[in-house]
Amino acid sequence: MAKLTKRMRVIREKVDATKQYDINEAIALLKELATAKFVESVDVAVNLGIDARKSDQNVRGATVLPHGTGRSVRVAVFTQGANAEAAKAAGAELVGMEDLADQIKKGEMNFDVVIASPDAMRVVGQLGQVLGPRGLMPNPKVGTVTPNVAEAVKNAKAGQVRYRNDKNGIIHTTIGKVDFDADKLKENLEALLVALKKAKPTQAKGVYIKKVSISTTMGAGVAVDQAGLSASVN
């Protein structure tokens, strides 16, 4: 059996794996246990009451968190003409068509989000094998294929998170950094859960949001009692 590190021993002593914590208590616990030498992200796992094997019950989308994620995001946009100028004005680092595709084919991937106008998908379509495995392929369901590329760039820069359930029906994403004020982390979590509720598949039966856990990059998950969240979530 692997020997527990001192950090993991402390976490095991502090975190009761059988308990659902009030959100404020959960955040305080994460902050106390975040001892890494960098500012850890606060991640969330949401167990949904869906059958992930059925395509009509899969949940996918995007939402802008009110306080952002604390990350600086580099955006690449496939578009042309007036849209290209609008994308640059909105803060996109890379804008182009075939020239941008050529850079990507060469392995130049200095960006975190890819956005495309519908007319550019003929170019982006060639890059599926490169962008797809990295989760970067533009998709209208998450607002990254859109005629309004400037707004999409602004959303990405403002702290938009994209979400998609895994094969077990769990959503994994981030809600900020551990040095955020507790209120901001709480409001970001609530905004995400409201977005997930709006995205509930009509075919999903029973309890939809079954479990919510938050953790830091290097820490253990802490289950959150949903009763302590705002009425808009419950």
Curated annotation (Swiss-Prot):
Ribonucleoprotein found in the keyword field: yes
Family, similarity comment: Belongs to the universal ribosomal protein uL1 family.
Modified residues (N6-succinyllysine): 105, 154, 186, 197
InterPro entries: Ribosom_uL1_bac-type, Ribosomal_uL1, Ribosomal_uL1-like, Ribosomal_uL1/biogenesis, Ribosomal_uL1_3-a/b-sand, Ribosomal_uL1_CS
Organism this protein belongs to: Escherichia coli (strain K12)
SUPFAM superfamilies to which the protein is assigned, alphabetical: Ribosomal protein L1
Subunit structure: Part of the 50S ribosomal subunit. Cross-links to the P and E site tRNAs.
MF annotations from Gene Ontology: rRNA binding; structural constituent of ribosome; tRNA binding
PROSITE patterns: RIBOSOMAL_L1 (PS01199)
Annotated GO biological process: cytoplasmic translation; negative regulation of translational initiation; ribosomal large subunit assembly
Keywords: Repressor, Ribonucleoprotein, Ribosomal protein, RNA-binding, rRNA-binding, Translation regulation, tRNA-binding
Record-level GO cellular component terms: cytoplasm; cytosol; cytosolic large ribosomal subunit
Coiled coil, from the record: none
Reported function: One of the primary rRNA binding proteins, it binds very close to the 3'-end of the 23S rRNA. Forms part of the L1 stalk. It is often not seen in high-resolution crystal structures, but can be seen in cryo_EM and 3D reconstruction models. These indicate that the distal end of the stalk moves by approximately 20 angstroms. This stalk movement is thought to be coupled to movement of deacylated tRNA into and out of the E site, and thus to participate in tRNA translocation. Contacts the P and E site tRNAs. Protein L1 is also a translational repressor protein, it controls the translation of the L11 operon by binding to its mRNA.
Name of the protein in its database record: Large ribosomal subunit protein uL1
Pfam families with a match to the protein in the record: Ribosomal_L1
